[in-house]
């Protein structure tokens, strides 16, 4: 299998090189990613349950869609591509809203890898049934729907099922902003 290559960027989001995904995560090199958080008209978020053998954050709940920006692609093009690959949904651009670009550096204690990214965070108004989403084989186990308002008050046992950064004020505020951008609040 051919090794996935990704662009390494500087703090100004300018490409400075090309490295393998493995090397990028082993060395904590800055690279580009996207997240899409599917939100429903009922003010819920649909989380993706990551596969147990993922190289970072295995078996945890994460953004509905996430992916690396491939060489030569834009963040938006990646969101469209990954959205369809990971959920089976053809992304309607009028329902996709950029909330912000974040610099995120996190260390996964389970795998010993560092994810150092500039990540475009999108919200997407999903008006379908979560049960109709297609799971990308090998990448995810399934999807779970959670009320956005419940995230601030989850108990510690429930929180262990998610990637920890989801409960930071930065992300809880992002979810609030996302609801406003989508006209849900």
Regions found by a protein language model. Give the residues of each.
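A residue-level structural signature of the nucleotidyltransferase/glycosyltransferase Rossmann-like core
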Residues: 6, 44-45, 143
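Nudix hydrolase/Nudix homology domain
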Residues: 22, 71, 100-105, 109, ...
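Short strand-connecting beta-turns/loops that link adjacent beta-strands
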Residues: 41-42, 138
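Acidic, metal-coordinating catalytic segment for phosphate/diphosphate chemistry
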Residues: 1-35, 39-41
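Detector for glycine-centered tight turns/loop "hinges" at secondary-structure junctions
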Residues: 13-14, 43, 88, 112
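A short coil-to-beta-strand element that immediately follows conserved catalytic motifs
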Residues: 90-100
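Conserved Nudix-box catalytic region and its N-terminal flanking loop in Nudix hydrolases
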Residues: 23-34, 44-81, 85
């Amino acid at each position: 299998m051919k090794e996935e290559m990704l662009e390494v960027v500087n703090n100004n989001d300018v490409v400075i090189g090309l490295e393998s995904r493995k090397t990028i995560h082993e060395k904590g090199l800055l690279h580009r990613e996207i997240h899409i958080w599917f939100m429903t008209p009922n003010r819920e978020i649909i989380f993706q349950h990551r596969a147990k053998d993922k190289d970072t954050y295995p078996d945890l709940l994460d953004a509905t869609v996430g992916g690396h920006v491939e060489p030569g692609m834009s963040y938006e093009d990646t969101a469209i591509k990954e959205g369809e690959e990971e959920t089976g949904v053809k992304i309607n651009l009028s329902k996709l809203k950029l909330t912000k670009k974040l610099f995120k550096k996190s260390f996964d204690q389970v795998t010993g890898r560092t994810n150092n990214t500039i990540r475009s965070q999108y919200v997407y108004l999903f008006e379908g049934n979560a049960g109709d989403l297609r799971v990308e084989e090998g990448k995810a186990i399934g999807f779970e729907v959670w009320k956005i308002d419940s995230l601030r008050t989850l108990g510690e046992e429930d929180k262990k099922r998610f990637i920890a950064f989801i409960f930071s004020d930065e992300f809880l505020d992002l979810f609030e902003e996302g609801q406003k951008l989508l006209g849900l609040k």
